[in-house]
């Protein structure tokens, strides 16, 4: 099977594996990127990618708050150029304000919320699409009511990552902000290990076992010793995706969970948005685009 050079390049960027290894992985996986990543990991040829989803869609994410509520949202555009357009940025801010003043609990409800202009969010998006010349869409949002505990938002400077955290008790604003910044940087999938689904654990253990098959030293160990080693490897992998088990980026001498425990607070909600998570953008070169229009 022929392998597209673009796929090899993309797989190398994700996994840091060698070119020929990436080619073999794609051949063995029928050119499926996700399956190729698993193949490389099973054969010990790639690092465990923190982010295996292909992130390609453009736009921005934003977290914003008022006295009663917090909202985090993602609005997509077709190009990065438009995502930096002042009209686009103003529209996203207008949508955030409208959602903050609503009780919308679903995307369908959110689209019907009216903005200060008198238009619904859906109508505003249609108008912006016509004015800007690209499809503009509200992809997702979450609206959270403030409680007696602490809450914090973090928006990265590039407008591509935002986080929203809610704690059960009061926490110093600087400490809360540092934890929110940690979540943005380290991208944990779960608050703690108890939240990790069995499917995820089983998939990771399968990969670890496949990797172990090629390790002669491991295979020579007694079965009970090997089992404990594999369990240890799984625990290490799970700690990478569990916030409370990650080393705190502000001070790596302790874990995030230990830090929060020392402050007598628990994290009850964690939301992290990154532009385009899970969306695969179709990339078309100029020649192909022109050819398609001539058909």
From Swiss-Prot:
Q: Does the keyword Aminoacyl-tRNA synthetase apply?
A: no
* Positions of region (Involved in Mg(2+) ion dislocation from EF-Tu): 79-82
Ordered alphabetically, the record's keywords are:
Cytoplasm, Elongation factor, Protein biosynthesis
Q: What is its main location?
A: cytoplasm
Among InterPro entries, the record links this protein to: EF-Ts_dimer_sf, Transl_elong_EFTs/EF1B, Transl_elong_EFTs/EF1B_dimer, Transl_elong_Ts_CS, UBA-like_sf
Q: Which cysteines are joined by disulfide bonds?
A: none
**What are the annotated GO cellular component locations?**
cytoplasm
Show the GO MF annotations. translation elongation factor activity
State where the protein is found.
Cytoplasm
Question: What the protein does?
Answer: Associates with the EF-Tu.GDP complex and induces the exchange of GDP to GTP. It remains bound to the aminoacyl-tRNA.EF-Tu.GTP complex up to the GTP hydrolysis stage on the ribosome.
Family membership = Belongs to the EF-Ts family.
Against NCBIfam families, the record matches this protein to:
tsf
Protein name per its UniProtKB record: Elongation factor Ts
Source organism of this protein record:
Mycoplasma mycoides subsp. mycoides SC (strain CCUG 32753 / NCTC 10114 / PG1)
